[in-house]
Amino acid sequence: MRILVSNDDGYFAPGIAALAAALGELGDVTVVAPERDRSGASNSLTLDRPLSLRRAANGFFFVNGTPTDCVHLAVTGMLDQLPDMVVSGVNHGANMGDDTLYSGTVAAATEGYLLGIPSIAVSLASWSATDFSVAAQVARDVAARLMRSPLPAPVLLNVNVPDCAGGAPKGTRVTRLGKRHKAEPVIRSQTPRGETVYWVGAAGAAADAGEGTDFHAVANGFVSVTPLQVDLTHTGQIAAVDTWLSA
């Protein structure tokens, strides 16, 4: 089995090292990841300059681009054979609800999905955790199950693992995406030279975190697995918009 691994935290991140080691138990792993932290890059492709591909001392490849660039470059220009699976992560911090629209971790998996490859995004729901071994083993188990018993194509799974402080999650829940409140306002600051600058504010708190959501599962100690798709069509409004335009 050939597995392509990427992330948005960068090729040097501990989460991707743990993930690559765990997935190495299943087959041949190739790591292609950004040269620096590209969190929040979403599905952006670099179109205004060429990309470079280099190899680090640990054997991982890194690209001066986005997570989407990494997967696109690897699949369409680097690898001699298509990977059987793309796995992105382990992200340092959750990617639940609206996070999935901004997440570079989810975007790397989405690019694999768009290229016809079963893909998984994996995140550890903690900003302070330093041990990614449990999340990496969860990723390995999900990938192994998908390998043994494939789901109907196309496949894009978003996996969030609770921080269990060295213990094990209570189990796994198949969930839908929850929803956050709108983000906090930008933070205004000044440079030492007096220039006004802005920092993007924190993500909003969970607004829809009821039973069945990814937020609820993780908050209660369960791994959340959410099947995703890319079709953004608001099917329920097609008739209403048609009537509106015809009036």
UniProtKB/Swiss-Prot annotation:
Gene3D superfamilies xref list: Survival protein SurE-like phosphatase/nucleotidase
UniProt superkingdom: Bacteria
EC number per UniProt: 3.1.3.5
Binding annotation for a divalent metal cation: D8, D9, S39, N91
Pfam families attached to this UniProt entry: SurE
Protein keywords: Cytoplasm, Hydrolase, Metal-binding, Nucleotide-binding
UniProt remark on cofactor binding: Binds 1 divalent metal cation per subunit.
Names of the cofactor(s): a divalent metal cation
Listed GO MF terms: 3'-nucleotidase activity; 5'-nucleotidase activity; exopolyphosphatase activity; metal ion binding; nucleotide binding
InterPro entries named in the record: SurE, SurE-like_Pase/nucleotidase, SurE-like_sf
Localisation per UniProt entry: Cytoplasm
Gene Ontology CC entries for this record: cytoplasm
SUPFAM superfamilies hit by this protein: SurE-like
Catalytic activity: a ribonucleoside 5'-phosphate + H2O = a ribonucleoside + phosphate
Primary role: Nucleotidase that shows phosphatase activity on nucleoside 5'-monophosphates.
The family this protein is said to belong to: Belongs to the SurE nucleotidase family.
NCBIfam families hit by this protein: PRK00346.1-3, PRK00346.1-4, surE
The protein's name: 5'-nucleotidase SurE
Source organism (scientific name): Azoarcus sp. (strain BH72)
